[in-house]
Swiss-Prot record:
Gene3D superfamilies for this protein: Arginyl tRNA synthetase N-terminal domain, HUPs, Isoleucyl-tRNA Synthetase, Domain 1
Family the UniProt entry places it in: Belongs to the class-I aminoacyl-tRNA synthetase family.
Identification of the protein by name: Arginine--tRNA ligase
Gene Ontology CC: cytoplasm
Principal EC category: ligase
Molecular function GO terms recorded: arginine-tRNA ligase activity; ATP binding
Pfam families per the UniProt record, alphabetical: Arg_tRNA_synt_N, DALR_1, tRNA-synt_1d
A Gene Ontology BP annotation from the UniProt entry: arginyl-tRNA aminoacylation
Subcellular location: Cytoplasm
Catalytic reaction equation(s): tRNA(Arg) + L-arginine + ATP = L-arginyl-tRNA(Arg) + AMP + diphosphate
E.C. numbers: 6.1.1.19
Residue numbers covered by motif 'HIGH' region: 112-122
Assigned keywords, A-Z: Aminoacyl-tRNA synthetase, ATP-binding, Cytoplasm, Ligase, Nucleotide-binding, Protein biosynthesis
Length: 527
């Protein structure tokens, strides 16, 4: 709708016009500050320019009113334009809010170590990545979702060792546990399965540990993929860190060629401080083994060689320090580091009845994503994880998400959608019977509700551009509240406005349905 207004204005002016939303609806639906930017060029006051622009824009049928106010030009959209757009949206649900942005984007998220089940920290990044992908595709971008498997480090050996020792314990043997190992019932379960798989006798030989490491990694990846599928998240690619190390010689040669590394104290250092890092970083240890950072450098070399327009990584907040060093490496490799965006997902704290949520016995010292999904459902989990900016700490009480009242936003929004279906049923009308009803002579409450329902495409575009999904969750909460308020205030069935209000409600339901779908949530028809 905003683009349609801008398109109309471009016919009447050769200037690029930026539209803003006035804080107070009495000043119209949109406003432009263009008179201020033209004032210096034309050597005239913004008020004079705004007066003239307002007169030239009045001729458009899409405006009910064009008014200059303190140098701004304010626009109030006509009922006929809003009705025309509403009718189109209802008849073209699959196209509503779509665009043709056309970027190719490689989106990497989750990338949890394959050494245990997914916990709620992983879940936040998973939900954010999936929602970003859905919004981006809706806006006409080609998005590839990728999971980076960290399978080259010592943690994979520790997984195999933990399974090995747990199996020996299961077989009644005395075990000396090391300081570092993986614990939790999932390790015991893997140990029992490993005994079945490899036989009791195999656990007398420590050479089995390497096999168990690879076997355990595969089992954990199966579990992770299953956990993600339970919340409707599927990846296009899985990339193994271990497999990528084959490219280290190639990458290291480029770094040396570009004078990006040097030797000191029997180690090889990356000159990352030259490009924004606080100090140089080790990429090769004294024993010749590449560091964790080297793995990241290889992976980003592999990414950028694939030629996407943009690369988005979703990392845990504890990886903040890695951004500058990875971007420095990208620069040294001859690529544009500005093409990489890193979104940081902060910690999640769960409560239950006001008390800290109990840690999972199965995982040891984590709260499992699967257990929370089982308790509150995937939809509630997704909505709450998207309800705040990713880089802010999130705390919520799972008991609140079980309530059937306005304090539970997921329920409240779904109730609005289900309520609209119920109203149509009570009225004995189908969508097809009211879809072409002209939305005219509406009161101000109805006009405001209609406009709010129709600005969903702008919210989608804004949420994706700023990578802030809470803009969409906030919008859906506000739209549902506005609908409930309207319905409680105005008579619908049996009134002279019945068909007009039913059509208005269909537009509200459409925006709720499309908005929730982009968050990975299916709107409920009945509750």
């Amino acid at each position: 709708m905003k683009k349609r207004v801008q398109s109309e204005l471009s016919k009447l002016s050769d200037k690029s016009i930026i539209l803003e939303k006035p804080r107070d609806r009495q000043f119209g639906h949109y406003a432009t500050p263009i008179a201020f930017s033209l004032a210096k060029e034309l050597r005239r006051s913004p008020m004079q320019i705004a007066d003239e622009l307002a007169k030239s824009f009045e001729s458009s049928s899409i405006f009910e009113k064009v008014e200059p106010i303190k140098g701004y030009v304010n626009f109030k959209l006509s009922e006929s334009f809003l009705d025309e757009y509403a009718t189109w949206a209802l008849k073209n649900e699959s196209e509503f809010g779509k665009d043709e942005q056309g970027e190719t984007i490689l989106l990497e998220f989750v990338s949890a170590n394959p050494t245990g089940p997914l916990h709620i920290g992983h879940a936040r990044g998973a939900v954010l990545g999936e929602a970003l992908s859905r919004l981006g595709k809706h806006l006409g971008n080609e998005i590839v979702k990728e999971y980076y498997i960290n399978d080259a480090g010592n943690q994979i050996y520790l997984l195999g060792l933990s399974i090995y020792l747990a199996a020996k314990e299961e077989l009644g043997q005395e075990v000396q546990w090391p300081q570092e190992y993986y614990r939790g019932d999932y390790i015991k379960d893997l140990a029992k399965e490993a005994i079945e798989e490899f036989g009791k006798e195999a656990f007398s030989d420590e050479s089995l540990i390497d096999k168990l490491s690879e076997w355990g990694k595969e089992k954990m990846m199966e579990l992770i993929v299953s956990n993600l599928a339970a919340v409707d998240i599927k990846f296009d690619h899985f990339v193994s860190e271990k497999a990528l190390y084959e490219k280290w010689d190639e990458v290291f040669a480029i770094l040396k060629e570009h004078d990006a590394v040097y030797e000191k104290d029997s180690k090889v250092w990356l000159k990352s401080s030259e490009y924004g890092d606080e100090k140089d970083r080790v990429v090769v240890r004294e024993d010749g083994r590449p560091t964790y950072l080297a793995g990241d450098i290889i992976y980003h070399y592999d990414k950028f060689k694939r030629g996407f327009d943009r690369y988005i990584n979703i990392w845990g907040a504890d990886h903040h320090g890695y951004i500058a060093r990875v971007k420095a490496a990208i620069k040294f490799l001859g690529f544009d580091p500005d093409k990489l965006e890193v979104l940081l997902a902060q910690m999640v704290s769960l409560l239950k009845g006001g008390e800290p949520y109990k840690m999972s016995k199965r995982a040891g010292n984590f709260i499992l994503m699967s257990e929370v999904v089982e308790e509150i459902g995937a939809d509630a989990l997704k909505f709450m994880f998207l309800s705040k900016k990713a880089d802010t700490h999130l705390e919520f009480d799972v008991d609140m998400l079980k309530k059937e009242d306005a304090s539970n936003p997921v329920y409240y929004i779904n109730y609005a959608h289900a309520r609209i279906n119920s109203v149509l049923e009570k009225a004995g009308k189908s969508a097809g019977e009211v879809i072409d009803t002209p939305l005219k002579d509406l009161n101000e409450d109805a006009k405001d509700l209609l406009f709010e329902a129709l600005i969903l495409p702008e919210i989608i575009e804004d949420a994706f551009a700023k990578r802030e999904l809470q803009r969409l969750t906030d919008y859906l909460k506000a739209l549902a509240a506005q609908f409930h308020s309207f319905y409680n205030k105005h008579k619908v069935i049996g009134s002279e406005y019945e068909d007009r209000y039913l059509k208005l409600f269909l537009v509200v339901a459409l925006s709720i349905r499309v908005g929730l779908r982009l968050l990975g949530i299916e709107a409920k028809k009945r509750m």
